[in-house]
Design a protein with these regions (language model features):
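Conserved beta-sheet core of the metallophosphoesterase superfamily
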Residues: 208-288
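Binuclear metal-dependent hydrolase catalytic cores centered on His/Asp/Glu-rich metal-binding motifs
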Residues: 141-156, 162, 168-213, 277-278
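Membrane-embedded segments
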Residues: 69-149, 154-157
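Beta-strand-turn-beta hairpins that frame and shape the catalytic cleft
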Residues: 58-71, 164-175, 257-262
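Active-site neighborhood of phospho(di)ester-bond hydrolases with catalytic His/Asp-centered motifs
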Residues: 73-74, 100-104, 129-135, 159-161, ...
Length: 292
């Protein structure tokens, strides 16, 4: 169970994904909404605020073999290192995580790669840090090799349809990172090719709709799936997302445990298309995972 309940922390949502054209149409709704912002909490304009959510993730064993502290950073859409990004860096350092995960859309332009370089330089350097691609890295035309090298310089491993295994206090852990559902070609079979079953399996997919559209092999059950992409709707007065990007599926934010592996959808940090968040405060997600 989570120790911090998010506004969208529920098991089902009826909203489907939309295209970039629909996103722009939704941004137009902002003109009518923003003048009311701040009048009530549900309409608070919150692009510069930051919340931290903490979650306990149960494992397969009644008695955990070890515990893993995980931090998820998603959807930075990094354009500068300002006050929000400084607060985020402080909280990442304070978290003393065993594992830092970057779940896509860290930048949306080649012009901002140097800000990403600076941000990663100031992040704590952990023995294990992983990143996956989002839709914006591909839409921006950033060469994959350039991203791989940039991440490597700061101790982060980019996973594109690939799995990596490591140990924590004798417990074996697998992290599987998929290509983006919207802009790439996620391939679960390729990511798990030649892998033996493991008692602790973490799946990273930028778009949460991957949970419903990809076949996960029964011999490789997933204990925790982490996604971003939705921004919690970004413009979500009173907690109701007006528009969701294609690839969101039925997911907005928070926990989903029905009909698949336990999924957490992080609201992320930045914004896209319009530099405003309403009712969808930026989020750093932290997990304490009980390992089998």
């Amino acid at each position: 169970m989570s120790t911090h309940r998010e506004p969208h922390d529920r098991s089902t949502h009826s909203r489907g994904g939309t295209s970039r054209r629909s996103l722009l149409a939704g941004a137009g709704m902002l003109a009518a909404t923003v003048p009311l912002a701040g009048a009530v909490d549900g309409l608070a304009v919150t692009p510069g605020r930051l919340t931290t959510s903490d979650h306990a993730v149960p494992g397969r064993a009644a008695t955990p073999a070890a515990r893993l502290r995980v931090v998820q950073v998603s959807d930075l859409h990094l354009k500068r290192i300002g006050g929000l990004q400084r607060r985020l860096l402080e909280r990442i350092h304070e978290s003393a995580a065993d594992l830092i995960l970057f779940t896509g859309d860290l930048v949306d332009s080649r012009a901002h790669l140097w800000q990403l370089e600076q941000f990663l330089r100031e992040c704590p350097r952990q023995p294990r840090s992983f990143a996956i691609l989002g839709n914006w890295e591909r839409w921006a035309g950033i060469p994959l090799e350039a991203l791989v090298r940039l991440y490597e310089r700061h101790g982060v491993e980019l996973l594109v349809n690939r799995s990596v295994e490591f140990e924590k206090d004798g417990a074996r852990i697998r992290v599987t990172g998929l290509d983006d559902l919207v802009s790439g070609r996620p391939d679960v079979a390729a990511a798990l090719d030649g892998m033996a079953p493991t008692p602790n399996h973490l799946l990273l997919a930028h778009c949460p709709a991957a949970r419903d559209s990809l076949a996960l092999p029964a011999e490789h059950p997933v204990d925790l799936m982490l996604s971003g992409h939705t921004h919690g709707g970004q413009i979500a007065p009173f907690g109701q997302a007006l528009v969701l990007p294609h690839g969101s599926g039925r997911y907005v934010a928070g926990w989903y445990r029905d009909g698949g592996p336990p999924l957490y959808v992080c609201r992320g940090i930045g914004t896209s298309l319009v530099p405003v968040r309403i009712g969808a405060t930026p989020e750093l997600a932290r997990f304490e995972w009980s390992l089998a």
